[in-house]
């Protein structure tokens, strides 16, 4: 929940879908590292919801990795639960609903957005969504590129996918030795106990896919469109629908885990089939880990432009006076405050809430700040966001 919000404020709801985790205690409900994003995302005035997925958090089920239906349902159920608790906890929804998430969370965000528009538009109308670096086209882009190469950066993901889907569908294999060679067929099930990390599982698995997957299996799958694996993959593609609300995907071109063409395929299909406000943003030649920060922040900033703001109680009586900062993004390390007295005092705060420096007057100097997102916080006039570019 955002802090200092006036009791009379109804607030927009942002559902953040988390990325791939193997350890149950890494789920948002345990306030894991990714769970901390909720504090940041709520600061502009959002009620932030961060669902655990089936098999994670306190659940002891096997997690059906990148399973669209259960991902979407986890988001819907948490929205419903938050709505039911609103009166007791003293908050209310303003009728705006947003969705975002990175990596697996990008897939889950797309699945949730589709579900909201398809089946809940009269109850929880989606305002905008920002899926980030997600495998939207599992059956095509993602698996084809994995199997066209001799190795994959995270073979644990592939094992997670197969074992997780089989826990739900039950028809991908009868015995894991049909899919994986020994000793992995015997050793892998025990590693997906909700306690092992991605690093531990990846270190256990071989570098080359030919040493992991049974010979001939890839050819068997690719040669049979009705193979259970292909059917499961197609059921969990999440891009073949036409969004009626703004949707923006973010990706990076050196992503070695979730191939960036997922976003391009999704964008092309949606626009060719009548979508009017679907786009994507290229974050440049970053790998999956380095892409996360810019993508998440970019998605947040983009969605904020669609949110109805509510005045908060901590900004002072003069907060309603209109003021702006320009240019924004800053140019050559400076920006200017317009619409406030020349004696105004301010602080520069980073996205963690840390005060970087303070000053007074209408010119704000960012020349010593690293590239990123900052906030100009005034004593009596409120807060404004500013982007700093080199």
Name these PLM-found stretches.
Residues 143, 230-231, 257, 264-265, ...:
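C-terminal catalytic histidine-bearing segment of alpha/beta-hydrolase fold enzymes
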Residues 5-40:
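Short, surface-exposed "cap/lid" segments of acyl-processing enzymes
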Residues 65-87:
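Alpha/beta-hydrolase active-site loop
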Residues 371-390:
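C-terminal tail/sorting-segment detector
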Residues 132-240:
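Accessory cap/linker subdomain of secreted extracellular hydrolases
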Residues 306-332, 339, 354-356:
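Residue-level detector of functionally pivotal "anchor" positions at catalytic/ligand-binding pockets or at interdomain
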Residues 248-255:
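Short beta-strand/loop motif that positions the catalytic acidic residue
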Residues 81-152:
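Primarily recognizes the serine-hydrolase "nucleophile elbow" in alpha/beta-hydrolase
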């Amino acid at each position: 929940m955002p802090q200092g919000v006036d009791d009379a404020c109804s607030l927009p709801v942002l559902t953040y879908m988390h990325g791939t985790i193997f350890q149950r205690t890494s789920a948002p409900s345990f306030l894991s590292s990714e769970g901390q994003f909720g504090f940041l995302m709520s600061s502009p005035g959002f009620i932030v919801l961060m669902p655990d997925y089936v098999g994670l958090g306190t659940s002891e089920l096997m997690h059906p990795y990148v399973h669209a239906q259960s991902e979407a349902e986890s988001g819907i159920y948490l929205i419903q639960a938050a709505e039911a608790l609103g009166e007791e906890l003293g908050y209310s929804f303003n009728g705006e609903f947003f969705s975002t998430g990175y990596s697996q969370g990008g897939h889950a965000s797309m699945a949730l957005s589709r579900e909201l528009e398809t089946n809940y538009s009269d109850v929880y109308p989606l305002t905008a969504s920002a899926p980030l670096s997600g495998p939207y086209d599992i059956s095509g882009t993602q698996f084809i590129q994995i199997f066209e190469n001799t190795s994959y950066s995270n073979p644990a993901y592939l094992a997670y996918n197969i074992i997780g889907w089989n826990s739900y569908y039950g028809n991908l294999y009868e015995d894991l030795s049909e899919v994986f060679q020994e000793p992995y067929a015997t050793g892998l099930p025990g590693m997906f106990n909700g306690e092992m990390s991605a690093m531990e599982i990846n270190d256990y698995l071989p570098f080359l896919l030919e040493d992991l997957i049974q010979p001939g299996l890839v050819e068997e799958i690719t040669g049979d469109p009705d193979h259970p694996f292909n059917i499961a993959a197609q059921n969990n593609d999440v891009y073949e629908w036409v969004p009626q609300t703004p949707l923006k995907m973010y990706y990076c071109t050196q992503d070695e885990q979730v191939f960036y063409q997922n976003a391009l395929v999704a964008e092309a299909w949606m626009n060719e089939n009548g979508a009017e406000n679907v786009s994507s943003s290229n974050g440049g030649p970053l790998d999956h880990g380095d892409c996360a920060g810019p993508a998440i922040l970019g998605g947040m900033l983009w969605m904020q432009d669609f949110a109805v703001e509510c005045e908060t109680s901590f900004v002072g009586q003069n907060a309603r006076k209109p003021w702006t900062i320009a240019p924004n993004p800053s140019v050559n390390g400076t920006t200017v405050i317009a619409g406030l007295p020349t004696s105004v005092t301010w602080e520069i705060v980073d996205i963690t809430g840390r005060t970087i420096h303070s000053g007074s007057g209408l010119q704000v100097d960012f020349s010593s700040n690293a590239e990123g997102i900052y906030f100009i916080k005034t004593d009596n006039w409120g807060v404004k966001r500013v982007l700093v570019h080199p």
